[in-house]
């Protein structure tokens, strides 16, 4: 999960629909493609929740607040994200987990998940230390509702193996040459170069040793 910047202008065609009058199924394939173009500008080809890869056949337009419980958000641009189709996680899990308070979930286009969540070299995710009781609850519930642990832990662990070695190289150099901080620029470049990759948040947390 990572901070997303949503553009203000809704996708073409979305404004002509109204909840209570139109069904979500009425949105045409061309209009859905326009929604995806706008979602791609915001989040690229990565799931808004797990940060994993998405593609045709492995994604769906996700209503942050479910249509069944919040029908007035059906055509609200601020309520739409792109989610992967991985069974048992992300949007699929959220829509099957039962009732919960929508205000509990971290909404990545208005909040920075980095404030709440910490990814470890082992692939796990947990609430950050030092959170207020309310924010700790929100972090815990976001992990639970979206099932950001479980099977995703193993997937992230596999992605992180090489970056753990890179982090250890930087750490060894910093310890061996405490007066030489040239490695810092190299580390920052590595973080920038991986920012577009799947699970980039977990990679960044490992490279910058945030779990220590």
List the model feature ranges, each with a label:
Residues 2-46, 70-75:
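Short, charged surface segments at domain edges that flank catalytic/cofactor-binding sites
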Residues 41, 74-78, 111, 133:
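Alpha-helix initiation and capping sites
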Residues 45, 57, 122-124:
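Beta-strand-connecting loop/turn residues
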Residues 45, 79-80, 114:
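Short, surface-exposed beta-edge/turn micro-motifs
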Residues 49-92, 98-100:
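Histidine-centered nuclease catalytic patch
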Residues 91-169:
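Conserved, surface-exposed functional patches that form binding/active-site neighborhoods
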Residues 133-212:
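C-terminal, charged low-complexity interaction regions
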């Amino acid at each position: 999960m990572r901070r997303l910047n949503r553009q203000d202008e809704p996708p073409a065609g979305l404004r002509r629909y109204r909840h209570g009058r139109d069904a979500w199924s009425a949105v045409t394939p061309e209009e859905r493609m326009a929604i995806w173009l706008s979602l791609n500008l915001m989040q690229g080809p990565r799931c808004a929740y797990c940060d994993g890869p998405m593609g045709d056949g492995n994604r769906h337009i996700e209503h942050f607040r479910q249509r069944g419980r919040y029908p007035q958000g059906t055509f609200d641009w601020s309520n739409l994200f792109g989610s992967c189709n991985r069974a048992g996680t992300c949007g699929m899990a959220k829509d099957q987990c039962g009732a919960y308070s929508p205000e509990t979930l971290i909404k990545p286009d208005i909040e920075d998940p980095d404030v709440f969540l910490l990814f470890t070299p082992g692939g796990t995710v947990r609430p950050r230390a030092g959170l207020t009781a309310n924010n700790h609850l929100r972090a815990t519930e976001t992990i639970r509702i979206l099932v950001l642990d479980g099977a995703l832990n193993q997937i992230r662990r596999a992605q992180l193996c090489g970056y753990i070695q890179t982090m250890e190289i930087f750490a060894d150099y910093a310890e061996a040459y405490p007066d030489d901080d040239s490695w810092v620029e190299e580390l920052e470049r590595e973080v920038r170069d991986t920012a577009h990759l799947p699970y980039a948040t977990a990679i960044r947390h490992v490279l910058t040793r945030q779990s220590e």
